[in-house]
Each structure stands twice: as structure tokens, then as C-alpha cells.
Amino acid sequence: MNVGVVAPQSSHWEDSHRAAAVLVKAFRRLGHSAWLVTSLFHEGAPALDPDLVEKSEAGFVEVEKDVSGVPTIRVLSTKPLLPTGAVAFRNFSRILGEVADSYGLDAVVVLSSFWNGPEEAARWAAVRRTLAAAGEAVRRTPLVYIPIYFPKFHATRPVDYASKVMWTTLNLPFILRQADLLVVCCPQEAAELRQFKTPPEKILVSSNWIDPDVAEALDSTPAAPPGGFEYVISYIGPLRGDRNVHLFVKIADKLKTAAVVVAGAGEAADELKQEAKVRKNLVFVGSHEPQVLASVIKSSVAGVDFSSYEPMGVRALEYMYAGVPFAASPNSRAAWYVANGVDGIHLNRSEAVDEFLTWVEMLVKRPEVRDEMGRKAKKKAAGLTADKLAAAIIERISS
């Protein structure tokens, strides 16, 4: 089967973006042909010369050795001055038709909310259905939508909030109607979508989002904690202001005997590097290689995310897969995976440093509690790899 997986941009750190590349890898592991279909952008910056796409005849170019790590088709796109700051595809319903015909796509999977890719894909699907109903010989290409719909909108300005509410009101119902299958992370997200009168049989609930490469690394890579410290706490993800990564500097100042490891990339990376130069216990990691991240995770007594908004929370699952308890921000979907007080904790607010430190102190003083939490986390996340999700999608759209 040939599958196109559509996402706003590629990333090694942003869960809602890297999930698309993870799914491409998963389909390919199962023997299918799959491509990431995305914008010009990787981590917010152009991944190739924009002129290559602008001057292409069909509005897209294929990049075999793409920075995303998977075969990638990059399409006409821009970063308009929209309130949401989202990437926008240009003329995508036409381009998607060209891609589908050129690559013989048997399925199109579209990820994420609050951007125009899902709406354009839904319009393309609606046109094909209309043509088929009129008697045209149209290739059946199911549309799978993975909304990553998290109702706790992160809005720094009223206009941003209004834009997301309008998208939910005007665009989401149309997309849900046109999709052949909806994939959601958990029963809570399914309940949100049923408010739009989505038939239950159209919804596939799955938390299988762990990168198979990361899972293999976690299974085989030994822990390698920085020397000279009693224990390690860590964060892996985007380094931006809304992720509250400045709090790790504060934590490093408070935990003199612990290593505070921060792995990621983003606008706050340079500042964190400078802070790490004057604090031996603040360790910055810029590599996204699975073995490196696996070592960070397995060396940690606990993982944490202080984000103001995290709509997917896959990193939490990776920590749990390794048997590492996780502290989830209330504005992170990780709070839907972590059972409070069982395999991690729910922070009362996104900047709850003292609450997190009190919990870590307890884990260090009572290793039997930490080990029990770790066992429960590992049991919950066991087998939640993306290849199982890919197989479930293929089974549902083939039936």
C-alpha cells in the first residue's frame, strides 16, 4: 500500500510534527511505501531552497535524504502572519491530487488541527466523492484524519484564541464528515469529537505513538548518567518560551547535587547553552539520535514537561516505556497518559517547580516508591509503538 502522511512541518522535537515522520517509518517497517508530505519548513526554518518548490511544475519536490529522516515530499507553503502562526499550504487540494496520482496513493493521512492542510485534504476528498457519484472512474483513496485535538487552546492573545475557536466551529465539522477514519489518542479525545456527532465506528482510539527506533534504543542502550551527581532529572522537547525551559536553570540552581539534562532545539537553545556554561549540573544535549535520547531517559530518576501547551505528549510515553516516572503539566496531553500518583504525577500548574522538586526529593529518599512507579509506567507503555498504530490504520481502511 502507498501512503502519504501530511503534516504542517517536520521536526525532531515537536511531538505533533515529528509524529508524522514516526508514522511514515512505521508504515515502511510493515512493508508499505510511505512518504511524509509537508511544507518547506523543518523546526520553523526552510529545509531546502524555496525556489526549488516554487519553480517545480507540479508544486512539490521529493527529497529522498530529507532532514526529517524519512522520504519526504515538500509542497508549496508559506508562514503567513496569521494569529496562530501556523504554516499554511498553498493550493494544496490541487497539489494533493497531483501527489496522489503521481505516487498512486492508496491512503492519505493528515495530522493536526488549526491549520489549512486538513481542510484542503477534506475538500480534495469531497471532490473525488462527487466525481465518483457522477460515474467518473476515480481511484478510492481513504482519508484518515489525526486531529491531535486538544481543547485547552494555548492562546497568548485574544485574536489567537478567536482564530482557533473559529477553526473549530467552521472547519473541523467539515473535515470530520469527509474523513473515512479518525485516529485519536485516548477516550477523552474521542469524547470531544463525538460532540461533533461523529459516529463511534469512525473513530480509532490508539496511544501507539512511540517511535520504534526510540523503543529499540531504549531496549538496548545502557544508562550513562553524567558523572559526579547523585541523580538526574531531564526534559526532552522543543526549547521555546511557551515550554517554560527557563525553569530548568532555576532547578539547576536549587539541585546542586543533581544533573539537570535538557535535550532539544529551538529559540531558547542558545540561552540555555550559555547558562549551562556557568552551571556544571545543567547539561545541554542537542542530538536527536535515538541512542543519545535513550541514554538521557534511562539515566533519569524522573522526566518532566513544564509546557504551557503540549497537544500530544509522546515523550511522556517514551519515558514510561523505559520505566521512568513522568511529571506532566496540566496543559499537556501527557496528563491523559500519566495516572496521578501511580506512574507519575500531574502538576497543579505548568510552572510548578516546587511541587516537582518535592516529588523528586521523595523519589530519591524512597527508591522503592520510584521503582514501583517505574514498573507501573513500564507496564502501561509496553508495546505502544507506532508500527501497531500503522497496522491498525491499514486494517481499518482495508475492511
Where are these regions (language model features)?
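Conserved donor-binding/catalytic core segment of Leloir-type glycosyltransferases
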Residues: 225-243, 249-253
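An aromatic- and histidine-rich active-site surface loop
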Residues: 88-92, 108-136, 145-153
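Carbohydrate-associated surface elements
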Residues: 188, 209
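Short hydrophobic beta-strand element within catalytic cores of glycosyltransferases
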Residues: 302, 325-329
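N-terminal subdomain of nucleotide-sugar transferases
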Residues: 1-58, 253
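Nucleotide-activated donor-binding/catalytic signature segment of Leloir-type glycosyltransferases, i.e.
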Residues: 271-291
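Aromatic "clamp/platform" in nucleotide-sugar-dependent glycosyltransferases that forms part
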Residues: 308
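Nucleotide-sugar donor phosphate/pyrophosphate-binding loop at the beta->alpha transition
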Residues: 132-133, 138, 142, 152-174, ...
